[in-house]
C-alpha cells in the first residue's frame, strides 16, 4: 500500500506529498524488517527535502527515519550522523510543531 501511495503521490502531488510518502514507505519497510530498502527510501526522503529547501520539521522526519533505518540495519556510524542531523533539525522546529515529533525524538533518544 505504501509503495502505491508513493507512486500516485509522485504523479498527483507536490514534492511534499512525495517526501511524506517516502517517509511512510521507509516506516513500512522497517516494520517488514527490510532495512536496506528502508534506508534507501529514507535517503530519498531526505534528498527530496534538501532539493526543495524543506522546513526543519520535514527534514527532522527524514533524518529521523534514516537514523532509525540505519541503526536497525546495523550501521551505527551512519546512524550517529543521521541522528545528530535529526536532532539539529528538531532544535529548529517551531514550538507549535514539536508535539508531532515526540515519538521519533523518543525513538532517537532510546
Regions found by a protein language model. Give the residues of each.
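Amphipathic alpha-helical segments of tetratricopeptide repeats
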Residues: 2-10, 43-51, 84-95
